């Protein structure tokens, strides 16, 4: 059985200036701050912003490359309990030691063949 990805859950983005980025997305799209200082094991100023169906996880990297960078993107997965076995079956690299537990959800992080990190989450938007 395949993993059943339902939606793109969120986009995790490196930004040069956190305050400027939050202002941009608030002013242009009406996004609100869903979580202040991100408590997600990231050693950089960060926030989660968005609306009911879109979440952007922004963290500040002032000296990042001019073209920007997406740290990872997330899929909400219907059959979460099958992720580890399915990844092992296909030889997919599992990151961070397996299941990562958050306040309201849990995730498994994997690496695609091009080196992009994907977060496979149990609950849409991490329950935020």
Task: State each model region's role.
Residues 4-7, 65-69, 101-102:
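Short glycine-enriched loop/turn motifs at secondary-structure junctions
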Residues 18, 73-117:
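Vicinal oxygen chelate
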């Amino acid at each position: 059985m395949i993993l059943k990805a339902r939606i793109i859950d969120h986009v995790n983005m490196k930004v040069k200036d956190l305050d400027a980025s939050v202002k941009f997305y608030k002013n242009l799209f009406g996004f609100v701050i869903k979580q202040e200082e991100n408590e997600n094991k990231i050693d950089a100023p960060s926030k989660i912003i968005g609306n009911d169906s879109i979440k952007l996880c922004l963290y500040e990297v002032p000296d990042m490359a001019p073209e920007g960078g997406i740290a990872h993107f997330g899929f909400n997965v219907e059959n979460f309990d099958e992720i580890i076995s399915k990844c092992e079956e296909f030889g997919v690299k599992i990151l961070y030691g397996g299941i990562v537990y958050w306040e309201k959800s849990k995730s498994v992080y994997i690496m695609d063949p091009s080196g992009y990190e994907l977060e496979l989450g149990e609950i849409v938007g991490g329950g935020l």
